[in-house]
Swiss-Prot record:
<protein>
    <recommendedName>
        <fullName>Delta-myrmicitoxin-Mri1a</fullName>
    </recommendedName>
</protein>
<dbReference type="GO" id="GO:0090729">
    <property type="term" value="F:toxin activity"/>
</dbReference>
<keyword id="KW-0964">Secreted</keyword>
<comment type="similarity">
    <text>Belongs to the formicidae venom clade 1 family.</text>
</comment>
<keyword id="KW-0800">Toxin</keyword>
<keyword id="KW-0872">Ion channel impairing toxin</keyword>
<keyword id="KW-0027">Amidation</keyword>
<keyword id="KW-0528">Neurotoxin</keyword>
<dbReference type="GO" id="GO:0017080">
    <property type="term" value="F:sodium channel regulator activity"/>
</dbReference>
<comment type="function">
    <text>Vertebrate selective toxin that causes moderate pain by targeting tetrodotoxin (TTX)-sensitive sodium channels in peripheral sensory neurons. Shows moderate and low activities towards hNav1.6/SCN8A (EC(50)=3.3 uM) and hNav1.7/SCN9A (EC(50)&gt;10 uM), respectively. At both hNav1.6/SCN8A and hNav1.7/SCN9A, causes a small sustained current, a reduction in peak current amplitude, and a hyperpolarising shift in the voltage dependence of activation. The small sustained current remains after repolarisation at Nav1.7/SCN9A, but not at Nav1.6/SCN8A.</text>
</comment>
<feature type="modified residue" description="Asparagine amide">
    <location>
        <position position="103"/>
    </location>
</feature>
<dbReference type="GO" id="GO:0005576">
    <property type="term" value="C:extracellular region"/>
</dbReference>
<keyword id="KW-0732">Signal</keyword>
<feature type="propeptide">
    <location>
        <begin position="24"/>
        <end position="83"/>
    </location>
</feature>
<feature type="signal peptide">
    <location>
        <begin position="1"/>
        <end position="23"/>
    </location>
</feature>
<keyword id="KW-0738">Voltage-gated sodium channel impairing toxin</keyword>
Amino acid sequence: MEVPKFLFIAVIVIALSSSLTWAHPMAAPDPNAEAAAGAWAEPAAEPAAEAVAEAAAEAAAEAAAEAVAEAVAEALAEAESEPGLPLLALLMTLPFIQHAITNG
């Protein structure tokens, strides 16, 4: 059974138009919304509290990276007899590597 060309084109047009509605500028949040809120906006956090939170987040990220590296090293050491396990260990670390690259 052959699909009519106009039906194929109609499906593509509908799919593209539905995806474009999500990218419409009116769907984006207003960057000036906080300035317009004025007194209703929350007070900014103190710089010292922000620095402490940032340092804690960096320490947690470093600890997680060290834990992943240690787990990968252990998995590779145990997997010498089974050739598929190093590949599995590598594939399981890809999300962590991507997170570390994209989030600094």
